[in-house]
Amino acid sequence: LHDKPYTVFKGHKRIIDFVEDSCRTWANIVDNFIPGEVYNVAGKPEWERDIKQYSDLILKAIGKDDSLVTYEEAEPFTTKIKTIDCSKAERDLNHNPKITPEEGIKRTVEWMRWNYRV
């Protein structure tokens, strides 16, 4: 939104989730608290995307091309693919993300445009 350059590392994959889905899950802890338990909360496994795909979705949502993007083969000292198992949160906290990355990115861009007037 601010026309600042950024770097995308090829081959890196992530699963993102929308804040509304995460907050709904965390709110369920109130009624389902189990002391000492740890939970992973993220989007659905089938939403895993290459970082470049997420970048392309964002660029599309803001109506920009990739001229400000530098593509690099690998980021040093990091895990290329970060897969998250949310099965325990699904079982204990009724975690059930509904907002796809495409919709979540669109909503986030709209929110940022409204709140930051960009």
Model feature map: region roles:
Residues 1:
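Active-site Tyr-X1-5-Lys
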Residues 4-118:
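C-terminal substrate-binding subdomain of Rossmann-fold SDR/epimerase-dehydratase oxidoreductases
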